[in-house]
């Protein structure tokens, strides 16, 4: 057996946390104990970790001091962040965290900031010769409507999202052909459609936020999950997003898509990212790069986050990682489902804040 590990896992209430915790614990090589943090006292992962703590949100001034307090108390071997909102603050404070003798699985601050701003990311990739969807940055309502016409509206659908957002917050599709009665009676209440007149009315008397306005892309949604070291892709897998519920992907299929992997490799090289990176495509086009872990499709003999830990700790070579490519089971279906648990008395973890 290899030396045991203590991992500090952030955002243990995120959708992918339960499966990751189970897979990392059942790695077959070593014992792993978990320190889990989240801002939500009802975070699902609190029931699965060994040492749970509530911390402030990542944008709170007390987040990093609270994180450092947990580290000083628990002395983990590795800090493994999961949320987009956390990787930036953690990366900017990486030196301070590492001074407490903990390895940090996070990219450098500059590429993280680039990826977390959708417009800046597209501008950077385009300037380095990578293909992007057609997009604009309108500064006011008039420009927004004019840019929509340049994208083919109203004959073609367009979509927009904030430059900086998390998940699908702020994303909408503008389609003049949508039927409001159909949306009301037949569609789920969290649909993403809006009409142009509704958008104009919404921002008629207030400043227009920073939106990325872009062509609406057709085709299947695919994700490349990568393990990267200073921009070099060491291992990658591709999955589809077959079905979703409440905006959350529930069914995936593992695919052999060398074209998407090739694009992802070029983007990783230009950005200089590290560790687990999630690259999203719609059809043939890039739509997003998340500088963090995503929902993985696991195999018993291929657990990407565990391999990432081994790379971080210097326990595996590039050649050994590359050999895992032959293990990928193309066509494999992964199904996510809801689980529940009950407790007689809710155990509220410790709250550590800056004093």
Residue ranges and their predicted role:
Residues 5, 11, 74, 242-247, ...:
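ATP-dependent carboxylate activation and anion-phosphoryl transfer catalytic cores
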Residues 184-249, 253-263, 283-285:
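Phosphate-binding site of ATP-dependent enzymes
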